């Protein structure tokens, strides 16, 4: 069984590269949905549908033992739903590095570059609110 890495395009290849370096004895499947990229300009419902469809394929049909959602937009839109749908499968999402930026800087001012959909969603707002006081 493999660990699946999913992104809306090819950006997640850098995540896959790091995973291979850290876990060289694991098998990996990479799926980049270039046909539907970019996800950031789509509606929440569209991103959820695409992400859930690809996760289903990777987990149920490709028998992935874990899933890395290597896309901020897909993470923001669907990672909670995926964790509910597949409680026995470890699912890891990628989020903007707000926490490390806030923790490791004195008097932090952080610029977050993200897709329009990621900016609109509650997940990023909650993350920023959680670390705003630091």
Residues of each region from the PLM?
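Non-catalytic structural scaffold of enzyme domains
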Residues: 1-134
């Amino acid at each position: 069984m493999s660990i699946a890495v999913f992104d809306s395009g090819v950006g997640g290849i850098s995540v896959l590269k790091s995973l291979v370096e850290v876990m060289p004895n694991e098998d990996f499947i990479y799926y980049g949905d270039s046909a539907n990229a970019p996800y950031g300009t789509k509606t929440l419902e569209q991103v959820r549908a695409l992400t859930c469809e690809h996760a289903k394929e990777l987990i149920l049909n490709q028998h992935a033992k874990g899933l890395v959602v290597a896309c901020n937009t897909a993470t923001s839109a669907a990672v909670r739903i995926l964790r509910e749908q597949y409680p026995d499968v470890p699912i890891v999402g990628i989020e903007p590095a707000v926490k490390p930026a806030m923790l490791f800087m004195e008097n932090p001012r952080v610029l977050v570059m993200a897709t329009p959909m990621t900016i609109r969603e509650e997940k990023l707002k909650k993350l920023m609110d959680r670390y705003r006081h630091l």
